[in-house]
């Protein structure tokens, strides 16, 4: 098992000013970090990758899509823009040295139609993702497609329908991830959800119900860790939490009150929680 920290707690773009955070996370005992990719600067990613290599920190990356580059849009030009930007994100992953590109890059974040996904949208989404997966293969990167709760997207909302989507895409570089925050909202049974997608799951976000320190809220952690162990999961456990460090990021993630002492406290306590819970399960 590898334990990591998503850097969105500090910023939506990691630059030299954030290098002390990387130093702290290495000292704390993390195996790696998750890099937000919202601006696709290959040179900057290469420099960051060098810093991470120096520290001995592994890395994954996360990105999203918006309305103007929605891979399930009825407009072919918009879909093509989404595919192109996802490919740019993969180029950045290659420069960064990231093995996984995670996130809800299957559709536009926060955009709704007033209904669930149509047959056309599912077809467009699969075609778009298959094209991205082809590029991922050339970059040596695996896609970890993330489903979100119904308040953030309408395309993929459960482990079961995401697993079906992955099977429709049918590409070895297209897999999925499981996020405890979204599952806590959408799934009727956590164990059944994890089992339903275990064949395709390559990444896990450890995220509390209020997006603060894992282990301090009401996510069903015992069932989560028990079932991950039962299904033989051995990939990343990546903490995803959000705070007030950047006003624009706080607004996007609907955070307006402080729910932890400090970012460092959250990171250290989260790592201790994950390690202790996993150790209990042999």
PLM region descriptions:
Residues 44-56, 128-136, 193-196, 223-228:
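Catalytic-core regions built around general acid/base machinery
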């Amino acid at each position: 098992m590898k334990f990591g920290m998503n850097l969105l707690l500090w910023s939506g773009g990691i630059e030299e000013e954030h290098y002390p955070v990387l130093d702290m996370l290495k000292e704390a005992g993390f195996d790696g970090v998750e890099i937000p990719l919202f601006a696709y600067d290959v040179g900057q990613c290469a420099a960051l990758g060098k810093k991470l290599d120096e520290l001995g920190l592994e890395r994954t990356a996360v990105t999203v899509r918006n309305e103007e580059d929605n891979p399930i849009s009825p407009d072919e030009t918009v879909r093509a823009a989404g595919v192109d930007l996802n490919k740019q994100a993969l180029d950045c992953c290659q420069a960064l040295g990231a093995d996984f590109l995670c996130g809800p890059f299957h559709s536009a974040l926060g955009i709704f139609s007033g209904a669930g996904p149509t047959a056309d949208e599912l077809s467009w989404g699969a075609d778009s993702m298959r094209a991205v997966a082809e590029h991922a293969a050339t970059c040596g990167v695996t896609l970890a497609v993330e489903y979100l709760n119904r308040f953030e997207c309408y395309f993929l909302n459960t482990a079961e329908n995401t697993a079906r989507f992955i099977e429709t895409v049918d590409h070895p570089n297209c897999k999925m991830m499981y996020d405890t925050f979204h599952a806590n909202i959408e799934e009727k049974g956590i164990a059944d959800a994890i089992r339903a997608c275990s064949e395709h799951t390559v990444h896990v976000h450890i995220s509390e119900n209020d997006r603060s320190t894992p282990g301090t809220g009401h996510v069903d952690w015992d069932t989560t860790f028990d079932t991950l162990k039962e299904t033989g999961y051995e990939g990343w456990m990546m903490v995803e939490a959000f705070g007030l460090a950047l006003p624009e990021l706080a607004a996007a993630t609907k955070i307006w009150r402080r729910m932890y002492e400090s970012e460092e406290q959250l990171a250290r306590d989260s790592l201790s929680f994950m390690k202790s819970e996993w150790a209990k399960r042999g």
